[in-house]
Amino acid sequence: MSGINKIVLAYSGGLDTSAIIPWLKENYDAEIIAFVADVGQERDDLEGIEQKAIASGATKCIVKDLREEFVKEYVYPTLKTGAVYEGTYLLGTSMARPVIAKAMVEAALAEGADAISHGCTGKGNDQVRFEGAVAALAPQLKVIAPWRLWDMRSREDLLAYLETRNIPCKATLKKIYSRDANAWHISTEGGELESTWNEPSEAVWQWTVPAEQAPDQPEYVKLTVAQGEVVAVDDQPLSPHQILTTLNERAGKHGVGRIDITENRMVGMKSRGCYETPGGTVMVAALRAVEELVLDRPTRAWREKLGAEFSHLVYDGRWFTPLCKAIVASANAIAEDLDGEVVLKMYKGQVTAVQKKSPNSLYSEDFATFGADEVYDQSHAEGFIRLYTLASRIRAMKEQHQAIGGDHTHG
């Protein structure tokens, strides 16, 4: 196609992108470069991926290790805001898209590409996230979205397309799931999940065991938090990615972090997905425990507002925006005092903070005790209550006055 000489494809080796390489070769007179982002997905997914991309028709395959950058620069800032989409979704796929798109744009510019391509469907959120990032970072790049162009409409069509071209793929007609994994989570959609009346089979879950099959004894883990970031597990300092992978393994064995939700997509439809975020669920519990100790009431309320707004920004693909930067800056300021240690209990699908302390804690046992104390004069509460309820008292007095025929105009 005129004006396009080199295309960088976001390549996973999965069903969609396995079909896109030959499709691009057949429909565009351009060089195809496969770009693989390692954000902590299953190691099996990366094994032999360069050879597979070349065999599928790519002239080159770039594999970029983004694991530490993903957790440090995208997961941790999101955790500080407290963002949770629609009350349950910890934004695993949403957070990964901007780091992938940014690295992909950098690769496209370095390779002198004219366009990028992705395997996102025309029904999903990811097309908006990828293309929104490109628009913000390199608007001169063209975007090719095969799912919005070709005549294939189902995963079955793609399997047939690949079979005629002798291109291998793990997906089968018997087990058709759409999965997305990174260091933070793994999501599963499709198959029996397309009916909300179907209970997910155990084949859906990859990282976690059923709660009823989890160990009968709880496991405890101690997390150290510094300025709103988890920096150590059981007093052992680790990198952000190492911390997450460690917690994924330990929490997954106890069935922690499973959710089955039906969410509102950006494009207007609802979708159902089963998400597993074992380590992330533990980290969130630890950070909330430290917040409970450190943040005063108005600061915590503000942080909750930040989280609500940020969850939509991340979900909607608006990471590279001024508002996103402003919210992250505000969350970082709040997190400056979020230092502490938390012991969490993992048991039968649940995680609970059972011990917590912070050098910046506003909790005082002397003030909070239900026993005798020497620091709090309870008579002081009377004056506070009179001022706190003053507006209510004035309103009630005026209503009483009006009810007996008093002056309705006097202010």
Curated annotation (Swiss-Prot):
Keywords: Amino-acid biosynthesis, Arginine biosynthesis, ATP-binding, Cytoplasm, Ligase, Nucleotide-binding. The keyword S-adenosyl-L-methionine does not apply. One of its GO terms (cellular component) is cytoplasm. It is found in: Cytoplasm. GO terms for biological process: argininosuccinate metabolic process; L-arginine biosynthetic process; urea cycle. CDD domains: ASS (cd01999). Its EC number is 6.3.4.5. It is an enzyme of class 6 (ligase). PROSITE patterns: ARGININOSUCCIN_SYN_1, ARGININOSUCCIN_SYN_2. Belongs to the argininosuccinate synthase family. Type 1 subfamily. Homotetramer. PANTHER family: ARGININOSUCCINATE SYNTHASE (PTHR11587:SF2). This is Argininosuccinate synthase. The lineage of its organism: Bacteria, Pseudomonadati, Pseudomonadota, Gammaproteobacteria, Aeromonadales.
